[in-house]
Amino acid sequence: MKKATILVSLVFLVSVVYSQQGSVVSAQVDPGYFITHTKEELIRKLVDRPCGIIPDDPIRVMLEKLGTYLETFIPDTEYSDDVYAKAANEQALRSVMQGGYGIGAVLIDKSGKIIAADYNSQIQKHRSDLHAEMTLLTNFERSLKAKKFMNIYVYKQGLTVFSSAEPCPMCLVRISITGADTKYCTPGPEDGMVTRINYLPSYWKDLALKQKVELGDCSPIMQKIAHLLFYSYLLDDRGPK
């Protein structure tokens, strides 16, 4: 009887753990989702979002519907970084609506307040260096308020750069030089540097790892929208030819 009771208890415990793991796994996004190569793939994914987009919508209408959804989206409190994901995605959309690439970034202080926000401006300003994170940090460092957060060019502890997309090599190194932590909303399996951090020269790798460098705690819907904004250039083939 005692053995039977123990066995039943073990079965119950395993079933509970399995169900909990299943719920966690179901909340994650299939890694394959974060690879998009064609306009057709992108449109299918846009239509699948709860934004009311249909395949025949003009590009401008698709983006406006996405913008309306983002504007009314309430960050999920189960995900500690969802409010920053929304803010970064809103910046990314601003760039897209201007004809630029869909990446945005925000700077967060140690209290969790967003103190700066910006977006990719490469196309708009004809500047190869103006990735979202680069634009964010440069404009912040030029601002009057930056003085209280900086020691010459290194930021005081507790600041975080949150990007809508996984930073590239240039941006990851720039963030590392400032001493800020790095977080991002959507992974970049084909171009992100965080997941390839071991390939950095040893000095830059060690510098980057002195701070937190990680995927943000974001809802699946924010991750997917960040990905779709990143690849929105496929809609009209914008950028250098």
Please name every model-derived segment:
Residues I115-I123, Q211-G216:
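Short beta->alpha transition motifs characteristic of CBS
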